[in-house]
């Protein structure tokens, strides 16, 4: 049959607008009218990324809009966090965690990134813990329960970090 429901992936809110990503284009949808407006294309973004030697996006489904008051989006390419201004078409900032990083947690309020390497926790380039084997920091403990699926928790301003420590 040719009749089927349209699958929409990656819908998210940016302030009062709904953002609908696709492979090649991001659209903004006005909730009251349903009017779609093109925000930016993957080709436009990739041109700027290539100029900055930051890699290329293969699709726009994983792009996030964590700032309701800024025309900026967040995405990762090859483990590198990239903040991109889609009004000015420019890379705002980039950060690549150290090799071996897992459990990355980007804080939109401060731009800090918490991550783990083996059993230790890092923020940006700095080691926060230096625990011996058998003591784990910054990762989920045992199993994901009560809607908790990570081991780090940023404060609202992004200047403090709470984390799980299991011995």
Where are the model-predicted features located?
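Beta-propeller folds
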Residues: 1-167
């Amino acid at each position: 049959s040719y009749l089927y429901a349209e699958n929409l992936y990656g819908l998210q809110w940016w302030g009062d607008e709904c953002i609908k990503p696709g492979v090649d284009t991001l659209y903004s949808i006005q909730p009251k009218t349903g009017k779609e407006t093109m925000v930016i294309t993957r080709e436009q973004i990739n041109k700027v990324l290539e100029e900055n030697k930051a890699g290329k996006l293969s699709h726009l489904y994983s792009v996030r809009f964590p700032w309701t008051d800024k025309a900026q989006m967040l995405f990762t390419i090859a483990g590198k966090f990239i903040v991109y201004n889609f009004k000015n078409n420019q890379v705002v900032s980039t950060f690549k965690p150290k090799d071996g990083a897992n459990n990355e947690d980007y804080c939109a309020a401060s731009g800090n990134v918490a991550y783990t390497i083996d059993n230790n926790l890092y923020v940006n380039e700095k080691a926060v813990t230096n625990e011996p084997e058998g003591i784990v920091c910054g990762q989920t403990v045992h199993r994901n329960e009560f809607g908790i699926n990570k081991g780090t928790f940023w404060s609202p301003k992004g200047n403090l970090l709470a984390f799980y420590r299991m011995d």
